[in-house]
Amino acid sequence: MKKWMSIPGFIITLIVPFFLILTAARIVANPFYLDYEYNQPGFPADPYGFTTQDRLKWGKLSLDYLFNQAGPEFLSAEKLPDGNPLYNDREMSHMIDVKKVVQSGLVAWYILIAVIALAGILTFRPGWKQTYWKAVERGGYLTILLILLVLLAVALNFDQFFASFHQLFFTSGSWLFYASDTLIRLFPIKLWSDGFTFTGILTLTGAILLSVLGRNLSRKIV
């Protein structure tokens, strides 16, 4: 029985990091993060004229597009005050790609929530409760290791990390834009570096909590 239970336990350990990372990313990818970032004293101003209110308006609209079920026309129909479209064709193509990644990430997140919750509900089965919480504990430790490595990479060379991250999900070069393009004006590198840092800190916090919780509960079970 223990050998059989080690298989789902191993699976739980592996999915905990993905669950925590996606949860933290979803928390950060919210309008309140844009409110916080755009209003930071040291946040870089847009050299091409966007005010903080402009950035909040268009930034939140763009974020909404990524998480809603609307088609590309949700953004492509938007015009800037000078009559030009909010995003040019290359930018819109990238936003469509980003939405696909985000929507896939949401589906994966929901599945992970369901798997972890179902496994937790099944802890009434003889012998499984200890295996489950031990797996959660190990998943927390694994997450801590991964996040420390990511935070180190961010601290040492964020530009390289950022490029590698995009190359993982998008066609080479499709995510590179001019400084005058709307995407760069709305979402400068400062916003991304802070976002990755906050996501890492939230994930690390969740991992520590789960590892402590799993450790305590697994040891209380005889």
Label each region the model flagged.
Residues 1-34:
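Hydrophobic secretory-pathway targeting helix
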Residues 174-222:
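Terminal transmembrane helical module of multi-pass membrane proteins
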Residues 2-11, 113-160, 209-222:
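Juxtamembrane interface at the cytosolic side of transmembrane helices
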Residues 46-59, 81-91, 106-120, 137-156, 201-206, 221-222:
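Hydrophobic alpha-helical transmembrane segments
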Residues 26-47, 167:
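Alpha-helical transmembrane signal-anchor/signal-peptide segments
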Residues 155-179:
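Juxtamembrane non-transmembrane "cap" segments at the membrane-aqueous interface
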